[in-house]
């Protein structure tokens, strides 16, 4: 078993760190709001550090799940950042969804300290984190990935190296583009279904086993029909991710017309006060548009 630090105890990070304890690892945690770290340690039995650097000191693996590019830079760099405390040969695993640009920046900064860096964004949402069945897409040197993979298996059902540094983040963009399209299509289908006076649950029971079936249909149709949007990844975070997708697509010269449109639909949801609603709330926008 390994000596591990986990940085960032939000709705994803807290259960992920808990699975590390269950797997038998010794875990030290750090969180910007210290009370969250103390509450986590009381529940799981780990220890709390005052800074990211202190949490990372002498650990074989340092894992992070924070908010965005700036948060990752802050948690890694500076005298209180994780890199300052990490020993040579240690591995930093970043589960945050950030730009490939900042990932490569952190990869280079880690290398200067003879620390390995793995970009490892996750898919599966809060439920996947709580149940330990996340999908984890990784960009890293082969050796760093092989060392970190058993640690990530504590909370990941599918853990795959996609390529070198930045490849994991780029794969996550593919994931988010696909999910955005699926959710808009499902929202339109269910809104149409209800407007036509059909029993939405009965319709889904028939079609979910066919070509239209998806994880989103299986797991979100009922809450979407009921107008309950507190069951997953928040719209605010999806807009952050889609912003990364669109910026990267521009750099690549790739057109993402549907993604750009759905991003604006999510902006409409934010304007409705739904920034913290889950991403299936696109259907609520359609309902309000239909109502005039």
Which residues does each PLM region occupy?
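Rossmann-fold dinucleotide-binding core
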Residues: 66, 98-176
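Hydrophobic residues within alpha-helices
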Residues: 16-17, 106, 192
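NAD(P)+-binding Rossmann beta1-loop-alpha1 motif at the extreme N-terminus of oxidoreductases
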Residues: 1-64, 90, 95-96
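Helical "substrate-binding/catalytic lid" subdomain
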Residues: 147, 167-290
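Hydrophobic beta-strand scaffold residues
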Residues: 27, 48, 116-118, 159, ...
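Rossmann-fold NAD(P) dinucleotide-binding segment
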Residues: 52-115
């Amino acid at each position: 078993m390994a000596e591990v630090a986990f940085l960032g105890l939000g709705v994803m990070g807290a259960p992920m760190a808990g699975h590390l304890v269950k797997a038998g690892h010794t875990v030290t945690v750090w969180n910007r709001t210290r009370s969250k770290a103390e509450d986590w340690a009381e529940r799981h039995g780990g220890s709390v550090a005052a800074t990211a650097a202190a949490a990372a000191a002498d650990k074989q693996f340092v894992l992070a799940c924070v908010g965005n590019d700036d948060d990752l830079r802050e948690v890694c760099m500076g005298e209180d950042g994780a890199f300052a405390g990490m020993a040579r040969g240690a591995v930093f695993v970043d589960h945050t969804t950030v730009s490939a640009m900042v990932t490569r920046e952190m990869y280079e900064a880690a290398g200067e300290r003879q620390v390995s860096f793995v970009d490892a964004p996750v898919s599966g949402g809060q439920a996947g984190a709580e149940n330990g069945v996340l999908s984890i897409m990784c960009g890293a040197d082969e050796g760093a990935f092989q060392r970190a993979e058993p640690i990530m298996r504590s909370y990941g059902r599918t853990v795959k190296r996609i390529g070198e540094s930045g490849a994991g983040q780029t794969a996550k963009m593919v994931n988010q583009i696909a999910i955005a399209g699926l959710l808009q299509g499902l929202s339109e289908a269910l809104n149409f279904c209800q407007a036509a006076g059909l029993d939405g649950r009965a319709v889904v029971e028939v079609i979910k086993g066919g070509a239209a079936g998806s994880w989103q249909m299986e797991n979100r149709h009922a809450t979407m029909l009921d107008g309950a949007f507190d069951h997953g990844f928040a719209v605010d975070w999806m807009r952050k991710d889609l912003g990364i997708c669109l910026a990267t697509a521009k750099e690549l010269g790739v057109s993402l017309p549907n993604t750009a449109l759905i991003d604006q639909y999510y902006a409409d949801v934010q304007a409705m006060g739904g920034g913290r609603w889950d991403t299936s709330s696109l259907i609520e926008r359609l309902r309000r548009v239909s109502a005039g």
